[in-house]
Amino acid sequence: MTDSTIIYTHTDEAPALATYSFLPVIQAYASTAGVNVETRDISLAGRIIASFPEHLEEGQRIADALAELGELAKTPEANIIKLPNVSASIPQLKAAVAELQGQGYALPDYPDDPKSDEEREIRARYDKIKGSAVNPVLREGNSDRRAPASVKNYAKAHPHRMGAWTSESKTNVATMGADDFRSTEKSAVIAEAGTLRIEHVAADGATTVLRASVPVLAGEVVDASVLHVDALRTFLDAQIARAKAEDVLFSVHLKATMMKVSDPIVFGHVVRAFFPKTFAKYGEVLVAAGLSPNDGLGTILNGLDGVPHIGAEIKASFEAEIAEGPALAMVDSDKGITNLHVPSDVIVDASMPAMIRTSGHMWGPDGNEADTLAVLPDSSYAGVYQVVIDDCRVHGAFDPSTMGSVPNVGLMAQKAEEYGSHDKTFEIAAAGTVRLVDATGNTVLEQEVAAGDIFRACQTKDAPIQDWVKLAVTRARATGVPAVFWLDEGRAHDAQLIAKVKTYLAEYDTDGLTIEILSPVEATAYSLERIRRGEDTISVTGNVLRDYLTDLFPILELGTSAKMLSVVPLMNGGGLFETGAGGSAPKHVQQLVKENYLRWDSLGEFLALAVSFEHLATTTGNARAQVLADTLDRATGSFLNEDKSPSRKLGGIDNRGSHFYLALYWAQELAKQTDDAALATAFEALAKTLGEQEETIVGELIAVQGSPADIGGYYQPDAAKASAVMRPSATFNQAIATLA
């Protein structure tokens, strides 16, 4: 790999399809500056294939690209553009495996209930792939996310639709506030490097090692907390009754993708709580049939056909309890898909902002919007959303044409906090104590547990905390905007961080800067007050709030989080550039297959590519890469001003048309820039050709719409078929080829 190499990740679903169209343009333009753009396959299918080489024929095997990029991210040369990928739930994982098996890959099935060592090994490999398995590996730095000026200005000039709020809205957040992860949390700072052992000690003294070795560094913050399941069930029963009494929709909002151990278990308890009679009567039958509430109501209902004699009876019981209970929030009212069907369908960081943007409503079973009780069982961050809801109830909806912005500096590096806890999270088998023990036998932290409780330990290393504080000061200095650390002195982990933040802030010149430390609830209120005045406020947060807020505020400001600039300055000098904060849009793929129209908006890719070129220019001295960055910035501004994003309706341009217009504006900017005469000459002919052939090219791109498209697979499309579908304009393809 040369020092002028950019890695452009091949991922999943809509962004992967967009890559077939946009990557040839990127590679052609980059080649004029001596920049090599390579791909690495970190798609769900690719990660599955790479994990089972011994099961596959030689020609089917592929390298572990994620592991390779994880190592690259630790080097100064790293320049990685990361597109959104699938964080697979178990149903998605099984679907991907089935598709690959159908394509001739002799992969083992996912063992739901492994019986042998071989099955346990297979299960362990698959479990490493599921959930948010990609981002923690690549994120060897903290996060700097913000709306670029061009995007913010466009949103102000063309405000997206916001649902009206009334003071009578009955929408609220429900959260436990006791016996949950936040309220039970204990925290310690490690004095010297070593290892910890996580063990369970039963009432009779029997000790079971849950995790033999957890490496820790000096200065690291380690936490232990427990979610008590008896309290969870009592809480859920009360909220189901409350939703019924208040005549609002019942909904639960979790993060079963990233929190892939704890949240599917919590989701399963919600399903059980909503259908108490059915599980009391048929629970053992469902277990025997391998149907778990953790996988969602949809998986259970689909599996009832395989339950002899009483499958229909069980289905009727579920339907009766749906009729008796509060109305369920729906994912798809037309298809009868409820909030409880699939654990990964309602993801809190996307679902809560969407609800707030839509008058505090979700969709009900009758196909109409309605006020909603949003259940966020753990209280760590639930209060943030309640403050926003209360603010809208008093002041009405936000106005995108005037509101301020909340850029984020997020503590993320080296699997910080909850998002690195998967391998230290356990569903407890028996009552007792779980403790973290150091190499000398001293108990560092311990928690009393009952059977079924969920124990979780988290780690946050000191070097990332120092880097996070530095990044916060840097951004505050660069923008002149107040920076607020969202830390709660009443929470054990946050109290440790507050002490460190105060220590490390003292090392910087903060004269003239406004830097506050407020609890998440206080920080939300402070930021909202400024937003309504049109003022910006930097949120400096931990890993989870980084994730939540970089959806919440962009969705309110811009209508989407996919238009955010997401830069990860890697701690060893490289750069990771994430294309927006949105997901991978499965419904976009369904529409493409149905009618050959892809409404994916690649603005996030355009923004990330520009800062990637800029980083390359800075680190390697490649002046032409800087010209590419500057001209791409200006081209993106023209792209927005001319409104060339996908039209979202048949007969208008889609993702492919947006790539043409970006290529046109970029070529025009390159042709007229004066920093590099040779580059200007190289793009003169292309700019002329694309301009003259605009009508022909757009016609060719639109002509294919309206008929089904065959891409040869969902999780692993056929490359030739997908390329043919995504590059249907021979005129455009030939023009781009002239640069090679």
What kind of region is each of these model predictions?
Residues 680-688:
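Short, charged, amphipathic alpha-helical segments
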Residues 626, 677-681:
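Short, solvent-exposed positions on alpha-helices
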Residues 698-714:
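A glycine-biased, small/acidic residue-tolerant capping/turn segment at secondary-structure junctions
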Residues 671-674:
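Ligand-binding pocket scaffold of soluble enzyme catalytic domains
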Residues 717-740:
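C-terminal accessory extensions/subdomains outside the catalytic/core fold
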Residues 2-268, 277-500, 504, 508-666, ...:
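Extended, well-ordered protein cores
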